[in-house]
A protein has these predicted regions:
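Short alpha-helix
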Residues: 162-178
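A conserved beta-strand element that flanks and buttresses the S-adenosyl-L-methionine
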Residues: 109
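Core SAM-dependent methyltransferase catalytic element
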Residues: 186-204
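Conserved class I S-adenosyl-L-methionine
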Residues: 1-40, 146-147
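Conserved beta-strand signature within the Rossmann-like core of class I S-adenosyl-L-methionine
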Residues: 135-143
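A short, conserved alpha-helix within the catalytic core of class I
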Residues: 117-127
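Short, glycine-/aromatic-enriched active-site segment of Class I SAM-dependent methyltransferases
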Residues: 143-161
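Class I SAM-dependent methyltransferase SAM/SAH-binding core
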Residues: 48-98
Length: 204
């Protein structure tokens, strides 16, 4: 059976309003990630959310008085349609890595996006070289990673490609891309869930 594009899956979920469940399900991890990253930023800051879904993180960032601009990008037409309806930023429909923003940003946030790419570590290099301003910060959260054994069945059960990397591979990928002050941390831990792997670093 041919593996389907992840954006098709997310469009189906948006039509069934599962984006709202994704928002509530990821909120704890994202809040912890923002609490890590925002104090690292030079203010005021511009931000882009990669894999923005219905734009809920963009709206959260826009409510921050120190956020001067926020942009969201997603490959799902239904998710972007919802994001534009709800407002709270500029939203673009595009698939990565074949799209580059017209400006660089101080903050790149991504939740549950990178492992859907065939080469997510190459995307980290693109973020570093083409998307991020000097002194900028990237933080990315992934629930599908080697140490989260329960996530190993997701590619088969959803019939979607996922790149499975270990915590150390993600950390080294950030270093190889050029980031400094690279750290990984488990966030959103709760009973029955080992946590979202948050990977973050700075462009000096």
């Amino acid at each position: 059976m041919t593996t389907r594009d992840a954006t098709e899956l997310f469009s189906e979920w948006a039509l069934r309003n599962r984006d709202e469940g994704m928002e509530s399900g990821h909120a704890k991890s994202v809040n912890e990630m923002l609490n890590i990253a925002i104090p690292m930023l030079v203010e005021p800051f511009s931000a882009i959310d990669v894999g923005c879904g219905n734009g809920w993180v963009c709206r959260k960032l826009q409510s921050n008085d120190n956020c001067s601009k926020v942009v969201g990008i997603d490959g799902s037409i239904e998710m972007i349609t919802k994001a534009k309806q709800k407002g709270g930023g500029q939203f673009h429909l595009a698939k990565l890595p074949g799209w580059t923003p017209s400006q660089k940003f101080d903050f790149i946030h991504s939740m549950e996006f990178l492992y859907y790419l065939k080469d997510p570590l190459e995307m980290l290099k693109i973020f570093f070289n083409e998307w991020l301003n000097d002194k900028g910060v990237l933080i990315a959260g992934v629930d599908h990673y080697l140490e989260n054994v329960e996530s190993h069945e997701w590619p088969k059960s959803l019939n979607v490609h996922m790149t499975t990397l270990s915590e150390e591979q993600w950390r080294q990928g950030m270093v190889d891309a050029g980031f400094t002050d690279v750290e990984t941390r488990r966030v959103g831990i709760k009973s029955g869930f080992v946590g979202t792997l948050a990977i973050y670093g700075r462009k000096d």
